[in-house]
Amino acid sequence: MTDATLRPPVPQGDYVPASRHGDLIHTSGMTPRRDGVLLSKGPVRNDTPLEEYQEAVQLACGNALTAARGQLVAGERLAGILSLTVYVAAEPGFEAHSRLADYASAFLREALGHQGIGARVAVGVATLPGNAPVEIQLVAFV
């Protein structure tokens, strides 16, 4: 999957997908939705191989990257990612947050090269909007 195949994310509330100040772009949290429809639900389960969540993580990350690129004007490109935050709704006892976040990092590296890798946080939470398994937020620079 490449972010070029994604349509702009559809906000699920009273917010914008991304905002820009100068050369910094902050995205809203993005879940694995296509055309506003959540494609993966439920918490990340301890007994499910991480590979089962790869598509959901990459879709959420692609939505965030698409939102960031939506703030560019003609002739601009994203120069890189400053930070990546990956929220993981998981069952109690889940410990592979960073390994799951690696799917997002790999997606960004493929899309932007070495500039796609910035600081990263992977956080476990009890629930996410719409019962999404992951939510991703980016800070990018132009």
Annotate each PLM feature.
Residues M1-L84, A90-V142:
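N-terminal presequence-like segments and the immediate start of the first folded domain
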